Amino acid sequence: ITHVAMDTHKKEHTVAVGYPGRDKPEILTVANTVVEIRRMVRRILKQAPGEVVFCYEAGCCGFALQRRIESYGGHCQVIAPSLVPVKRGEHVKTDRRDAIKLLTLFRAGLLTEVRAPDPQQEADRDLTRLRQSARENLQRVRHQILKLLGRHGYVYTDGDHWTVRHRNWMRSL
């Protein structure tokens, strides 16, 4: 089995390819574009003897990268970052080292795969998170407005805040 571990980022990925029988991995840097990902996957699938398995830590790429790799014929696992074993004293982090470390753990079978949601579940989850974030932002801004008014001596005492009556009172200031 050829193992491929990717340290993923928004703009580019560092890829460590562990071919069977080779101790030293091949290291690639790939732009995070459809064309470059396709080219990298096809190249590895062509060069590898037998099965190829890709992995990367869940994060900024979501599950789109997994779906893309699998659409090009590769098998890809998304790894739970919170369950990746960490050695004490490992403080120097580079993309290259992270990719090699992930490859080593992947080859040893020490990584835990997360279940990828289907695209509809992922879209629903994204929408729910965006809505929650918008609600929190709205609440924070409302508190900031009330604190600003209070610092300038304007305190509303005729009922609940953010009612039509309260908003009319603010407009009249």
Q: What function would you assign to each model-found segment?
A:
Residues V34-V53:
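Short, basic/hydrophobic alpha-helical segments
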